[in-house]
Amino acid sequence: MIKGLLLDFYGTVVEDDDTIMQAIADQVAADAATSVSRGHVMDAWTREYEAVAAGPQFRTLRHCAMRSLATVMAEVGCAGDPATLCAAQFRYWQSPPMRPGTREFLSQVTVPICVVSDVDRADLDTAMAHHGLAFAAVVTSEDVRAYKPDRAMFARALAALDLGADEVLHVGDSMSADVYGAHASGIPAVWINHRGQALPSGTPVAAEITDLTGLIELIA
């Protein structure tokens, strides 16, 4: 019996920042000294971000975003201030649009929810206030000083709800951070596949849904 839920936030409860990141990548590609595509900038930015986030010293998400973008800008010869370019992304984190189905789901769910999000606490608090959202518990990467898939994130969430791994589902859109992160902690994972991707063979998912309304029957 499911007694609680762990929910990713960006890409699960609210829309992810893909569009904003693509716009930033477009600007970097347009201003680069060499001919590069948006896709090249996006791939490089993602790679550098993951390297910074996985480093030995914890960095806030805002720092990770700016530091990794600065590295990519230097690589392609793009002059400018990464903080200025990232400003739109930071604003987005504080007022993202709600994902389809979220309001309907939240109006029907009865089990306690802990949000588990790779984001700075102030940005998440502002985003939740923007939409008038409240949950039983909230765990951010800044609170734990670690990012998913680190087990510490999931352990903190379970402790916050006072539930065991076999009593909850973790729900998120990231295969690496959410699905494999939860699986490594012994928590069944539900994948939010809002991009219409093919589920890789052997992926440890308890269920695949497109939005949170798909959870209603799963936890009934």
What do the predicted segments below correspond to?
Residues 2-103, 120-122:
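N-terminal helical cap/lid subdomain that shapes the substrate entry/recognition surface
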